[in-house]
Regions:
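Charged, well-structured alpha/beta interaction segments
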Residues: 3-36, 168, 174, 179, ...
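Alpha-helical support elements that line or immediately flank enzyme active sites
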Residues: 128-133, 167, 171
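Flexible, solvent-exposed loop/hinge segments and secondary-structure transition points
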Residues: 5, 9, 22, 29-128, ...
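Extracytoplasmic/periplasmic C-terminal soluble domains
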Residues: 142-187
Length: 187
């Protein structure tokens, strides 16, 4: 068999496999996903005023103290025995302690396996409520109620406690702040 014939045979096989894996398998699966779970199939996007502000299943950083902070992002894949990991966790703990949390929950200190975990344990979220109440000038009880409304889970086999979606909670927190500000009497 000549080189050209082998090349054409390889190209045809590649195109056939592409057609099989992309068209024959993926498109029907996407169609079923859109029927069964349309929100998840569309990326679980969250919107505010019609604009996409993030994805429910992907964690994102919030730089302002006015927001609930999620898990650290960008997992370094360091072994538990690596001194750099211990230094990172100690530095994160000191940062939270300066912010008023004497014993931060583990998920405030440790990266998630994926580095983009959108959830936070209720314990870690509750630890941040006093700061949010102070920054937003909202009653702590109101924030506790909001946290209970956004409680999910436990999720999956590894989670032993309920969680909160950080982006979803922060969007609700913004809405609560707007409602609270509009109900204040004018000076």
């Amino acid at each position: 068999m000549s080189f050209t014939a082998q090349l054409l045979r390889g190209v045809r096989l590649t195109l056939l496999l592409w057609l099989l894996t992309v068209v024959v398998i993926t498109l029907p699966l996407l169609g079923v996903a859109r029927l069964v779970a349309p929100e998840a199939a569309a990326g679980s996007l969250l919107r505010r005023d019609g604009a996409v502000v993030g994805a429910r299943l992907i964690g994102q950083p919030f730089g302002s103290a006015r927001y609930l902070q999620g898990r650290p992002a960008g997992a370094p894949n360091l072994a538990a025995s690596n001194p750099e990991l211990s230094q990172r966790v100690a530095a994160a703990a000191k940062g939270w302690q300066r912010g008023g949390i004497s014993q931060p929950a583990p998920d405030l200190l440790q990266d998630s396996a994926s580095g983009v975990d959108p959830h936070l344990s209720l314990t870690a979220a509750r630890q941040q409520l006093p700061r949010l109440a102070r920054e937003r000038q909202l009653p702590l009880e109101e924030l506790e109620r909001l946290l209970r409304q956004h409680r999910e889970g436990p999720l999956g086999l590894q989670a032993i406690e309920p969680v909160v979606n950080v982006l979803g909670f922060n969007l609700a927190l913004d809405a609560l702040s707007v409602r609270a500000a509009s109900s204040q009497p004018a000076p």
